[in-house]
Amino acid sequence: MDTIAITYQKHNKSYPYYGYLRALAKKQHTLLICDDEPDLLELYAAMLSDEYKIIKTASGEECIQRYNEMKDKLENITVILLDFRIGKVTGDKIARDIKEINGAKIILISAYEIDHDLINKLKDEKVIMEFVPKPISLDTLKRIIAKTIWNDGYQ
């Protein structure tokens, strides 16, 4: 097996192989996106499909089902982007159900005002990693997803 050694200078922030490493890492991670608004679901998928494998679901039940299917195939879903209001079910309920299965890195998103105590409780219980209010810019969303992917533990 060949070994590639990559060096960089931390102090002057010179990362000559950054583009190469980014290309190697492209599409290594799978995002499960769950939103019951078809336009938003398609928009998120289109915005993120260049960098990630995307699985789209439009209901809480489908989200849990697809998560289980991928787990059973031993395929890893890296992050779940989960809308808070999905039909009659809330995202915190879905997130708790997924946590009981095997846990996952979940980013909860919502266009609605959500009680800060609930969000803090979900984070403290390690049910979600982040909460993001809608609307959200593409750059901010990508930054939060990247932070979530590379975070090995819950903060």
For the regions a language model picked out, list residue spans one by one.
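Active-site residues of response regulator receiver
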Residues: 82-83
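Non-catalytic signal-transmission and effector/linker regions of two-component phosphorelay proteins
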Residues: 1-30, 38, 137-155
